[in-house]
Amino acid sequence: MPTDPFAKFPARATVTTAAGGHLVSIAYGWEHPDDGPQDGLVVIGPADDGDSLVALWGDSWHQKPTPMTLSGSRGAGATLELEGEYGGGWRWRVRFDATDPDTFRMQMDNVIPDEHATAEVAAGPYPVMIMQTGRA
C-alpha cells in the first residue's frame, strides 16, 4: 500500500527484440522483502493504429497467475508507459525509461480508484516497485 516502505534489493532486466524487431521482450527479476525472489515478463508491440502499444504482462508477485493485457504509448525520449485495469477500477501502470545510456529504469504504480480513496490514502497512482539497472 502507499504507506509501505521501500526495500532495496538487487534487480536485473534483459531487453530483447523478437519477431523481426516488431516485439520487445523485457524479462526482469527482483526481490520482495518477505517473499523472496520474484520475476516477470513484458512483451510489447505496436497496436493496430500504429501509434499505440499493446503488451502482455505477468509478474510472479504483482500479477499472477493470469497474465494481464496492457495498452499505452511511447513517451518523450526512450520511454514507454503501459496501463491496464485488473478489477473494480484498480489499475497497474508500468513505465520503462531507457533515456539514459547507462541505466534502464522500470517503475510499477498501483492506481487507486477514486471510490477507494480515504482520508489517509489518496486516489491515484503510487509506486510499488522502482527498478534501476546498469546497461551492459
Q: Which sequence ranges carry the predicted segments?
A:
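Hydrophobic small-molecule pocket/channel-lining residues, especially in calycin-type beta-barrels
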Residues: M1-A136
